[in-house]
Amino acid sequence: MFPHRVSHLSKLFSRRFPNWKRKVQTDSWSNVPEHIHSKIGRNLFQKEGHPICSLRQLLEQQFQKFEMNNVQKESPIVSVETNFDSLGFPKTHVSRSKSDTYYMNNKTCLRTHTSAHQPEEFSRLAKEGFKKNGFLITADVYRRDEVDSSHYPIFHQMEGALVWNRNDTAKMKNDLKKVALSPSLKSMVDDETTALETHNDMQDIYSLEETKFVSQHLKDTLTTVIHDLVSLAPSISSGAEQVRYRWTYDSFPFTKPSFQLEIDWKGKWLEILGCGVVQDRLLKGAGLNNYIGWAFGIGLERLAMILYGIPDIRLFWSLDERFSKQFLPNKISTFKPFSKYPACFKDIAFWINNDFNPNDFYEIIRDVCQDMVESVNLIDQYTAKSGKTSLCYRVNYRSMERSLRNEEIDKLQEKLRNRVANSLRVELR
C-alpha cells in the first residue's frame, strides 16, 4: 500500500505498539500507519468525563433493565476470520480491501466493527447458563475513509443484542407489552418497515409472527432509548428544538431483516444506528439452538456530535484542555467552540492509474499531515483525449489548536506531493 514502508515489512518481524503490550507479526499485508499506531490504547470510551465515555455510560444505564452484560473490548486486534468470515462477509466483499481495512498481517486486522465480537458474546451467554439476556459491547473501530469534519479513521461503536428462547412465547409477548408502554413512542416516528411479509426479507427458519415480534421489540426499544437520550441534550430539554425519527430498511450480512433508525436533526435526516434480527446461523454457531434475537450497532461519534454540538470529529482526539475541561461525567452539555484558527487551502493535481483508490490518497494525507487537515475535496476531474484522467483535490489545512504558519504548510504540502507520487505511482501536475 505504501511501498517505501512495505519494503522493510515484507520480512516478518515483531513490532510493539507504543501504547500496546502485544507483539504482532507483520508482513506484506501490513498497512497500519504511524498515526493509527499512536492512538491504539487511548481508549476514549473509558476516559471518565470524555463525551464518548459519558455516552457509553448513559446508554448502559438506558439498557440496564434488560439485564445485559456490559463489555468493553480494549484490544482492537482481531483475526480476519473473526472480523469477516464468522459474520458471513463474502470473500469478495469490498470492506475486505486493503483500501478499506487496516491489516496487521494477512491473518489479523484492526476490527472494523464491534460486530466482530458478537459470536464470542453469544457463546458467553450460553456458557454462563443465560444469567443475562444479552450484551452491550463498546470498543474503538478502525476504517480507512475520506477526510472531512464527520469522518475519522478511528471511531467508536456500541453493539447490543437481546435473545429469547423460542419456546417461551409467554415471556416474548410480555416483554413486547412492556416496551410498548413507553411514553417515548409517542414521539414523531415514521416506520417504512411494517410490511415484512411483502418485503421478502425474512429468515426461513423463523415464522412471520416471531419475526414481527422481534422486529417490533427491537424498534420500540431503540426508539425509546434514543429518544430518551436525545432528550437530555440542552437544546431538546429546553424545548428549543423538536426531533422526529424514522425507520427504513437496510442490509447487513449478520441480520435479516435489517433496519436503520434515522433522526431528523436541523432539517437533515441522519443515520443513527443499524440493526435487525440476528441470523440464526450465528446463534447456532454460538450454541444458542432454538433461540431468536435482535442486534444493533450505534456509532457513538455521530450521536455525540449531535447531542454535544461538536462540529468536528477530530476534536474527540484533542488533548487541548479547552476541550476536555468542558465536560463532566454522565452529563450532556453544549460544546463551546474556542477560537477557530484560519484555514489555508492547497491544491494537488495528478494523473491517476487504474489502481487508484481515493481512500489510499486520504490515508497518505492523514499520515503526513496528522490532524492538521480539516477536509479534502475533489474540485476537478478531467479526461484527456489519450484516455488518461486527472484529478485535482483541494486540501483544507486548519488546526483545531493553533495557527499554522505558511512555511509550515508549504513544507507539509511538498512532503505530501512526494508521498503521493512515490506511494500511489501517479504523475503529479
UniProtKB/Swiss-Prot annotation:
Q: Which PROSITE patterns match?
A: AA_TRNA_LIGASE_II, FDX_ACB
Domain FDX-ACB span(s) in chain numbering: 339-429
- Which molecular function term from Gene Ontology is one that the record holds? tRNA binding
Q: Which GO terms describe its cellular component?
A: cytoplasm; mitochondrial matrix; mitochondrion
| Gene3D superfamilies xref list | Bira Bifunctional Protein, Domain 2, Ferrodoxin-fold anticodon-binding domain
Query: PANTHER family in the record, alphabetically?
Result: PHENYLALANINE--TRNA LIGASE, MITOCHONDRIAL, PHENYLALANYL-TRNA SYNTHETASE
Q: What is this protein called?
A: Phenylalanine--tRNA ligase, mitochondrial
Q: Per UniProt, where does substrate bind?
A: 115-118, 143, 150-152, 157-159, 271, 296
Question: Keyword set for this entry?
Answer: Aminoacyl-tRNA synthetase, ATP-binding, Ligase, Mitochondrion, Nucleotide-binding, Protein biosynthesis, Transit peptide
